[in-house]
């Protein structure tokens, strides 16, 4: 194998793993229709929604009318209860310890309780989780107790009134670029993707278009910075809103501004850093400090991406899902309503507001997507390099990593075998 072709082929292989699709994974069944009622109830219950939220989702999204008494009967028949039949304390401790080995070391007991409930299916009280964290991670509890964050006033009239999007570059020294979008009113994360670039306008445009197709419309306005990555989204948004009759139709529907003033998404990046990516930054710095990773070595960068992007994407999906399902407490800003982002976004009627989603017809979507978005096949890898990577993993019995440690081991193994071919 020629030395000059290896970095290029590695890059192609990486792109195969970094798919250019981006709507939040379908953890919540919001598609209208008439699926099995009891299955819907079980799904919403396991996501942590309370009785009134479950009933409202069933009625307003699925057209299923149910009383609290009927709901309780269904839950009883399925043996679903949050205050009885608590999980074994050893299972709880084991799950907490597993989370503390990763980014869970950054979160408090409320988020830890949510992870145990949603990801592990454990029935446990918040108080038990609080005591477990105090016992297993006293230093972390003390550090988090000193943290305070002051936010500026903000106003949005309803879901899809304004979306905020931005790139997150804290992991860029390691070849990992994150891009995300958040709804201004509900604070629901609309997409959160990691890949080799968040500056390619065609890739970022695909994130936006996938979200528009999933929701069936575009927002009233979008706010982003003047980076080159936003030029396609700005053109798409203006085109999709070209026939609007409101004051923000057409080109006015994309608002440019400095990244630091894009308040909603910038505040959420702070949350992401404190609750997830800070752990990953330190993890990758450790690889660099011991000489396993060199950020000016293209081979190291591509190998790190190959081994860690799928794992990190899974983690980001989990962080976004948990955020969208968590309950936000009342704040001094009356324009930021309390509640769960998912409930605020999908059921705005409960708070007396309307969704500002602007319907988009399929012809418009397809036309814009074809012109300004990357195609799925563009992000696929070179077949010969896929065969090379599979050969290395198969010949050496290397498994797809499930944890950061396993990904680190795979990184070392793949790097060793590829360098031996040069």
Regions found by a protein language model. Give the residues of each.
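RNase H-like DDE/DDD metal-dependent nuclease/strand-transfer catalytic core used by mobile genetic elements
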Residues: 59, 121-143, 148-333, 381, ...
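Protein C-terminal end segments and domain termini
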Residues: 328-422
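A short, amphipathic alpha-helix used for macromolecular contacts
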Residues: 30-59, 85-128, 165-171
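Short Lys/Arg-enriched helix C-cap and helix-to-coil transition segments
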Residues: 81-97, 141-153
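Major-groove recognition helix of helix-turn-helix-like DNA-binding domains
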Residues: 40, 64-81, 125-137
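Positively charged n-region of N-terminal signal peptides that target proteins for export
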Residues: 2-3
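Short amphipathic alpha-helical segments embedded in low-complexity Lys/Glu-rich regions
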Residues: 115, 146-150, 338-341
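Basic, amphipathic alpha-helix used for nucleic-acid engagement in HTH/winged-helix/SANT-Myb modules
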Residues: 7-39, 69-90
